[in-house]
Structure formats: C-alpha cells, structure tokens
Amino acid sequence: MEDYFAGKLTEIQETEDTAYLLENNEIFYDIGYKVMQNQENVNLLKCHRLKYNGKIKLVYFTRDDTSLADCLAKSDIDGVLNLIHRLIEAMLQIENLGFLNMACIDNRLSHIFVEPGTQNVKIIYLPVNLAGVH
C-alpha cells in the first residue's frame, strides 16, 4: 500500500483493479464525485464508492486496460506521439468540465490507462477535498 496526499489516501493493491482508501471520510469531495458520475467523459475512469471497514474505498476497474507506461514502452515514435497527444486531449477535456481539480488526478504513468482497440486514454480522478488542493 502506498500513501498519497500526506497519508490521507492509501492505494490498496488487492485485486487487478485500482483502489484507494480514504483515511478520513471527511475528505471525500461529493460534488466532484457527482460531476464524475454525471459525465459521459470517455477519458475519466468510472469511480465506484464503497464502504470498507467504515472508510470510503474508491474503486476503478482497470483490469481490461493497459497502463500508459506499458504502452509507451512498447510503442514506436509515432505511437508515443499519438499517446502523448491523446493524454493532452484527455487532460484538457477533464479540465474543461469545471469542478474537478487537476491536482486530484493520479498522474503516475502506471496509473493512467489506455483502452485496447480505441487507444482512448483513461484517467483516475480522486474525488477528494484536501486543504490546499480544492
């Protein structure tokens, strides 16, 4: 498990999917979560909110996708440029939604995903409200 946001968020590595556990339920950003659920944004990974030992667990189904890090490692220069272009487009699309703070994106290349076949870039947005972030 890895800690993020000064230990207020922990990544859980228990399945093929990606999940995070909020150490304090008060940091959950309900407006951001609702914006995510109401958007038909092809670049946001769908977030599922569950309860886990009384804490909020955020689950993103990533098992069918490939990490951007793996895609970049296997791509030629044209493929790399295409993936970078798609990543920039995805970031701009999310930024234009409003209500979502770009600082709450898990920006590690191993946690940005590419959908096989379509090559759509999928991004994990963490709906959290932290001092200095929102």
Which residues are covered by each model-predicted region?
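Conserved structural core of kinase catalytic domains
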Residues: E2-I84
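Structured beta-strand/turn binding interfaces of compact recognition modules in eukaryotic regulators
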Residues: R63, S110, I124-L126
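Elongated alpha-helical scaffolds
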Residues: N82, R86-E89, F113
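Protein kinase catalytic-loop region centered on the HRD/HxD motif
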Residues: E89-A103
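Hydrophobic residue at the +6 position relative to the catalytic HRD Asp in the kinase catalytic loop
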Residues: I105, S110-V114
